[in-house]
Amino acid sequence: MTYDKAELVALDKKYVWHHLTQHKNFEPAIYVKGEGMRITDIDGKTYLDAVSGGVWTVNVGYGRKEIVDAVAKQMMEMCYFANGIGNVPTIKFSEKLISKMPGMSRVYLSNSGSEANEKAFKIVRQIGQLKHGGKKTGILYRARDYHGTTIGTLSACGQFERKVQYGPFAPGFYEFPDCDVYRSKFGDCADLGVKMAKQLEEVILTVGPDELGAVIVEPMTAGGGILVPPAGYYETIREICDKYELLLIIDEVVCGLGRTGKWFGYQHFNVQPDIVTMAKGVASGYAPISCTVTTEKVFQDFVNDPADTDAYFRDISTFGGCTSGPAAALANIEIIERENLLENCTKMGDRLLEGLKGLMAKHPIIGDVRGKGLFAGIEIVKDRATKEPIAEAVANAMVGAAKQAGVLIGKTSRSFREFNNTLTLCPALIATEADIDEIVAGIDKAFTTVEQKFGL
């Protein structure tokens, strides 16, 4: 298909308000085709997409006819009815999803990661009313974690810059320290995970356990720097939650459905959550869908005397009734199963981390390389000894230089002031050895370009 670029750019500038974009002097890029891991722009230039759609979503790659056909077929048969009524793809998808999540039981559908987390917060607060006389409604969140863009989820946001100018926020949310191993105040010690986790207990005791009902965390901090918790961390978090009767919510919006080499990120860490939220990779971006998944125990807290008209979960999501989402999600899971993409993710993830670490000898501004599966971060610093973060302008230039080299990468952005210095990589689970090597080579070239530009 041919396009009139000048016309589209003019219309874009006139009518479109882009996400996360300063529009002063803005020249829009327009992508017109995706196939596998490749994106083609309106000028015909092709890029290797190492960020799965920019925000870590297209887990099984572009151009999946199987998913498109499943959605089209379902839309013709039954496109929508509010989710108080059952439909075939929701039932089948829910069964399939729960089969990947031992210990979990119920699936509640909505439209986005923010919405999925809002549902989790409402569950916690209503349980506080139903079981604790209005107490235990507070929610603890971890510094540098991100859970969404609504006022409620921003109230639980550990990334200060994302919250600027959007307050006042909802009451009853409390922050506890991050799990950044690279910059840990505890240094290198055998029980680092336990020490980091026990910082949660200190906040609980300060706020008061009777005021608190839940803890929410990402399995790996994503947009806050790709932080992988150390051994022993989540086991201790779970023990603390049990001690103070707190529900553990794990936000798998980024890591869920294979991103880290397991179905869910938490499955690397020997921890059983009470609530799991997910979105992005659930349908690989082919249709909007998110899920709030609970244990049977949590679900049963809302199965009460019908005469009590306040005692069930009085919540709805309009597009939680759109059947395209679960139809796409079911096909997405079947592709991951059939093509052994979890195994491929683990293998290619190891190759990616090895390749990136191999660049450290050549590029001294690389302070740390970390990640799990096909989810990796490269923290850039002025000096490895002091770990002083590089200027954000340098990290921004790296993204641009990588694009010039034909590879789309990301970076932490508007997250943690002075620490928006981590490059982010999240290629599709279908990546081959050749794809990984091309990503590493593109980043190597970008580092050389940027180092020369800034005299580093």
UniProtKB/Swiss-Prot annotation:
Cofactor entry? pyridoxal 5'-phosphate
In the UniProt entry for this protein, what further remark is given in the free-text comments?
Taurine is an abundant dietary and host-derived molecule whose metabolism to hydrogen sulfide (H2S) by members of the human gut microbiota has many prominent connections to host health and disease. The human gut bacterium and opportunistic pathogen Bilophila wadsworthia produces H2S when respiring sulfite (HSO3-) released from organosulfonate substrates such as taurine and isethionate.
Q: What does this protein do?
A: Involved in an anaerobic respiration pathway that converts the sulfonate taurine (2-aminoethanesulfonate) to ammonia, acetate and sulfide. Catalyzes the initial metabolic reaction of anaerobic taurine degradation, i.e. the transamination reaction between taurine and pyruvate leading to sulfoacetaldehyde and alanine. Is also able to transaminate hypotaurine (2-aminosulfinate), beta-alanine and with low activity cysteine and 3-aminopropanesulfonate in vitro. In addition to pyruvate, 2-oxobutyrate and oxaloacetate can also be used as amino group acceptors.
- Specify the signal sequence span: none
The protein's annotated pathway:
Organosulfur degradation; alkanesulfonate degradation
Q: Where in the cell is it found?
A: Cytoplasm
Temperature-related behavior of activity: Optimum temperature is 35 degrees Celsius.
PANTHER family found in the cross-reference section: AMINOTRANSFERASE (PTHR43094), AMINOTRANSFERASE CLASS-III (PTHR43094:SF1)
Query: Protein name, please?
Result: Taurine--pyruvate aminotransferase
Per the UniProt record, the source organism is Bilophila wadsworthia
Q: Which GO terms describe its molecular function?
A: beta-alanine:pyruvate transaminase activity; pyridoxal phosphate binding; taurine-pyruvate aminotransferase activity
Taxonomy, superkingdom: Bacteria
Which GO BP terms sit in this record? alkanesulfonate catabolic process
Enzyme Commission number(s) of this protein: 2.6.1.77
Principal place where this protein is found?
cytoplasm
UniProt note: pH dependence:
Optimum pH is 9.0.
- Sites where N6-(pyridoxal phosphate)lysine occurs are at K280
Q: Which gene encodes it?
A: tpa
